[in-house]
Amino acid sequence: MSMLAERRRKQKWAVDPRNTAWSNDDSKFGQKMLEKMGWSKGKGLGAQEQGATEHIKVKVKNNHLGLGATNNNEDNWIAHQDDFNQLLAALNTCHGQETADSSDNKEKKSFSLEEKSKISKNRVHYMKFTKGKDLSSRSETDLDCIFGKRRNKKLAQDGCSNSTADEADTSLTTTTTTTSAFTIQEYFAKRMAQLKSKSQAAAPGSDLSETPIEWKKGKKKTKEAAGTDIENSPQHKAKRHKKKKRVEAERGPAAKKRDQVELQPGGPSGDECSDASVEAAEDRVQTPDTQDDVPKPRKRRAKKTLQRPGGVAVDTAPDSAPVKKKKKVSR
């Protein structure tokens, strides 16, 4: 038993593996029909009997040659090259190479990139960039300016003269003049009338124009009514009361004492004190030189003083310390 023995498997052989019984049978229906049409053994099928006369057989390929190649064709590589050259020559004669001497071929075929991008289904360029990328529509001077080629002075002068002449011709041909029967004043008067008619058509009637004034008056009345309501409201009254208390606290106990002295029945009234203070201020202001002239009284705040019967003014400010308020004790 060898080391490389194959695994056992069952294999069935037919009685006629090559099917020779069918091929050797002359009583087949197809063969009879072909014989009626003129075919016989040893002939090929087809109008010219060019078909295969033998059965198809499997051939073993044990070399590196191409399919169908034999040892007889190995030395015929020069003939293959000649056949290839003949094929190229036939193609050149059919399509016809362009000669270099012909003047028509010297002219370059120019095409518009913009038109090509419009015609083509696929987008070649964006529409706003096609004009900039298309150089076929540019002249030689434009291309020279782009690529920086120098030109002779004579050619430049000739080009300038030609361009000026062309510009003059185009300016003469393209000038357009318009004449109107209206003067400037009539034109502007007509325009103003049109604008007024538009504004009148767009603006509402006189009733609508009067409504804003009445609305403003009503708004002012509502504001005044709201102000009076705010003044009479309890919150506003409470705020005023707090403000009054704050002012009295800032004035201090001395001012309160002075008010109490003024309100005593034996003491002078506030009007007399104020009159006396005003007279004293006027005496101070007047000088002996200007007694005849009446000077303008200066506005000054005079301290309130008590005047005794003897004419001596006494300050009502107490020397003692301020009186403290008694706190209420809840029981």
Curated annotation (Swiss-Prot):
Pfam families, alphabetized: G-patch
Location(s) in or outside the cell: Nucleus; Nucleus, Nucleolus; Chromosome, Telomere; Chromosome, Centromere, Kinetochore
PROSITE patterns xrefs: G_PATCH
Record's comment describing the protein's domains: The TID (telomerase inhibiting domain) domain is sufficient to bind TERT and inhibits its activity.
Subunit structure and binding partners: Interacts with MCRS1, TERT, TERF1, NCL/nucleolin, and the telomerase RNA.
Function: Microtubule-binding protein essential for faithful chromosome segregation. Mediates TRF1 and TERT accumulation in nucleolus and enhances TRF1 binding to telomeres. Inhibits telomerase activity. May inhibit cell proliferation and act as tumor suppressor.
Protein name from the UniProt record: PIN2/TERF1-interacting telomerase inhibitor 1
Annotated source species: Rattus norvegicus (Rat)
Gene from which the chain derives: Pinx1
